[in-house]
């Protein structure tokens, strides 16, 4: 199922940040969000993931299909690596964590408490959770933060494998992940203009 976004307006702190956002994300496709810091990429991802409502526009194809990885890894520090993955697998009604351990080279760390991991190891564990959700649409906010070159390659390989099985990915990143056939959406030109701000504010109070 294609994720479709039509004429979306998103807000931060009640202020419109982006307007006129439209795109389709098909099965097996990746879309890279680009733009300077503060341009609205995180706000757009949070809106698409259902963490905040849009001010205007339509989103379809996301219902119970999204796995979202934010800046924070959100790990349970007193659980081991394997226990963290089992916890999140259970949340999504699943149990197999072996592919996640393998994809992010976490086998040797499986019994380590998450709180004792390095920043890069924590990030790998946070990203590995995507594989245990079973969700077909991945949305990721700067997923390569704290990762070294080898770990970035692991992540890119995991995304490619996900796309090959019909999954899709929407990724905000400043680096080239080398994903084949990935499209790019620059949010810079979609910054809400003063006219859009006024119109959106009026509509919000109708």
Swiss-Prot record:
Positions contributing to ATP binding: 35-42
EC number of the protein: 7.6.2.5
GO CC terms: plasma membrane
A Pfam family of this chain: ABC_tran
Subcellular location: Cell inner membrane
Residue ranges the record marks as coiled coil: none
Gene Ontology molecular function: ABC-type heme transporter activity; ATP binding; ATP hydrolysis activity
InterPro entries assigned to the protein according to its UniProt record, in alphabetical order: AAA+_ATPase, ABC_transporter-like_ATP-bd, ABC_transporter-like_CS, ABC_transptr_haem_export_CcmA, P-loop_NTPase
Origin: domain of life: Bacteria
Leading EC class: translocase
Entries under SMART domains matching the protein: AAA
SUPFAM superfamilies per the UniProt record, alphabetical: P-loop containing nucleoside triphosphate hydrolases (SSF52540)
Disulfide bond sites: none
Domain ABC transporter: from-to ranges: 3-206
Catalytic activity reported: heme b(in) + ATP + H2O = heme b(out) + ADP + phosphate + H(+)
An example Gene Ontology biological process: cytochrome complex assembly
Keywords recorded for this protein, A-Z: ATP-binding, Cell inner membrane, Cell membrane, Cytochrome c-type biogenesis, Membrane, Nucleotide-binding, Translocase, Transport
Subunit structure: The complex is composed of two ATP-binding proteins (CcmA) and two transmembrane proteins (CcmB).
Annotated protein name in UniProt: Cytochrome c biogenesis ATP-binding export protein CcmA
Biological source species: Roseobacter denitrificans (strain ATCC 33942 / OCh 114)
Gene: ccmA
